Curated annotation (Swiss-Prot):
GO terms for molecular function: large ribosomal subunit rRNA binding. One of its GO terms (biological process) is translation. This is Large ribosomal subunit protein uL10. Belongs to the universal ribosomal protein uL10 family. Pfam families: Ribosomal_L10. InterPro entries: Ribosomal_uL10 (IPR001790), Ribosomal_uL10-like_sf (IPR043141), Ribosomal_uL10_bac (IPR022973), Ribosomal_uL10_bac_type (IPR047865). It comes from Blochmanniella floridana. The keyword Nuclease does not apply. Forms part of the ribosomal stalk, playing a central role in the interaction of the ribosome with GTP-bound translation factors. SUPFAM superfamilies: Ribosomal protein L10-like. Keywords: Ribonucleoprotein, Ribosomal protein, RNA-binding, rRNA-binding. Part of the ribosomal stalk of the 50S ribosomal subunit. The N-terminus interacts with L11 and the large rRNA to form the base of the stalk. The C-terminus forms an elongated spine to which L12 dimers bind in a sequential fashion forming a multimeric L10(L12)X complex.
Amino acid sequence: MVLSIKKKEQIVCKIQEVFKISSSAVIASLSNITSNSMNQLRKESRDCGVYIKVIPNTLLRRALKNSLYECLSNFCIGQNIIAFSINNPSDAARVLVNFSKNNEYFKIAGAVCEGNFIDKDQIDMLSRLPNYNESLLQLILILKVMSVGKLINVLKILSNQIIEE
């Protein structure tokens, strides 16, 4: 399908708008991926609040130019997909890493998180970062354990004082 120049400009503008509101982006190779697998990936990404787009490389390079994500233009070779995390920086990495575990041909090329390039070896680490709700839960559990520990220490001190008297 041949796109008109106006349609191409609209695609580039839309991707640039997504760049402005996203906290991270991950690019991956799509060769030998079935349409059913792609539909599954789209469903998972929608559920996690991740915006994914298959876009021609020349248009992607134009959209990447003069942005925080410009270093990803080196990976615009072959058929690619780009995923954007809108809410949590690790969401896109988490969705694509989980998808790559079930699809041997799906290869993650690189990512950018808040302006810093992350190579494919470190993307697993990014995908394991807790999201906002998980972080809050961990903080609450730590505070809860600390307060119970303090209460036990106070009770132990009081019991020692009572025994001494």
